Amino acid sequence: MYQVWGWWAMLSFVQIFNLKYAVREYMKAQKFNHLTSARYALLYTSVCAFRTFLPRQDVSKICVFNTPLSSVFIGRSLATWAEIAFIKQLYLFNNSVLKTRLSYNIVYAIYIAEVFSWLGTLTENQIFNTSEEITWTATIFYILYKNVVTAIFSKKYMPQKVRKFLYLSILFKFLYIIAMVKIDIPNYLNNWQTNTTTFSLQDGFYRSISYRNVSTNYEDWKIHIGWMTPYFTIAVWYSILMARYQSYSVL
């Protein structure tokens, strides 16, 4: 129990600073022509903060606080908007700042991933969650490939700070793919094979609104702490940095 409360307190403290910096980048963005990226970052950061303050698990419906705001329906709805904002920010940043020409199909791919996520959340059949993670992994792999090509052939045309951020982006995406292939996707596949209880879309919809299983048991949260921590910290910082470096698109 104490491990979960300690994790929650630490991560909540970090979110206060994340919100501060996201708002600051949004205010600074008004001086340049890159408000869109800053809006995406602020939305993504705000939703991650909300999900930190009221942590919950979509499929199992486990949450820390027994409040209507902890409903999976609310949390998953906000997460959907945030993740779409994140992929749109990635598309904008790569095309305008890193000069990595990405297809807009990556956004459509994440729309599909969000459908998989909702199907997994409502039916609790984790083959859908597995499909979501595979879609995200394939999308990020495509962006990584394009970033590497840019780093090899176009880096000399970039400002030094942008070039360094490109290298950071490559590292970030590489580590993400490793984590997905080694940890997340196998976990969801294992859950799919061991969990035989599923629900109809209608029953799952009602459960997502009203059913909450309150727990601060570390065993219930151990795996989720492993992915929530980098999701609500590193990914948020990356989004805020994209908003900051978006000013290079007007140079």
Model-derived features: positions:
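Short aromatic-rich membrane-water interface segments that cap or initiate transmembrane helices
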Residues: 1, 66-81, 216-223
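Hydrophobic transmembrane alpha-helical segments in integral membrane proteins
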Residues: 1-17
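C-terminal transmembrane-bundle signature of multipass membrane proteins
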Residues: 12-20, 146-251
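Short helix-loop boundary/capping segments
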Residues: 112-169
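Transmembrane alpha-helix entry/boundary detector in multi-pass membrane proteins
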Residues: 72-79, 103-107, 127-140
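Internal transmembrane alpha-helix with an interfacial aromatic "cap," most often the third helix
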Residues: 16-26, 52-59, 76-124, 147-154
